[in-house]
Amino acid sequence: MKKFKYFIPVNRPLLNENDVSSVSLTVKSGWISSGSKIAEFEKRFANYTNKKYASCVSSGSAALEIAIKSLNIGYGDEVITPAFSIISNSNAIIKNLAKPILVDTDLDTWNIDIKQLKKKISSKTKALMLPHIYGFPNDMDKIQKICRLHKLYLIEDASEMIGQKYKKKICGSFGDVSTFSFYANKHITTGEGGMIVTNNKKIHNKINKLKNLSFGKKNRFNHDDIGWNYRFTNLQAALGLSQLNRIKQIVKKKYK
């Protein structure tokens, strides 16, 4: 195998001394699992995406799984998603016992082909799960029109789109439920982690239960649903807050 003199990374996380300081202070506080930084990060991220509610989770993949279940999508239901995307999209659908309906890609945008999408809608279709690919936003005007016409949920996977916009509106603000990833190669990172945003309080409350093992409200160990341990840590939130402070300059640098 030929060895190259220089290694050019696909991505390198942009971390600075403010990030180190934020995490260090949180470590010294002793609040390394739960803590106030989580709620602060959720509030600021909700504001940033123009959504009412935000909930931190352990990864972008976890966010997708919870998003599906929060909408009561399950056995016998179909969810349309692009064939060209990370496996997490289809996995989230399958793990919730629904059926992924794969649609090919538009060669100009790398996103889902809208003409083919329309042909795949059936009486069993409950939602569209649409990631924006490689920084190119989907045509959200057409997508939202389709969802309204067929009464479908829109799960917007904005994992690669933090800070990106479609017609001056922030990506991740279009979905009934929208998800984000904070993996090391994303615009802002917490090492691992994800976020789910929505304007629906009932859905938000269900998301918070599902990510925390669906503990009972009155009797903690009476679980009224099957949830996951998909929690986010106070340490991650501290890093996320610091990163979010400079999202504009991060996106600007990527454009260059």
Question: Which residues are covered by each model-predicted region?
Answer:
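Phosphate-binding glycine-rich loop
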Residues: 31-78, 92-104, 169
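Short, conserved catalytic or interaction motifs in soluble domains
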Residues: 59, 105, 133, 184, ...
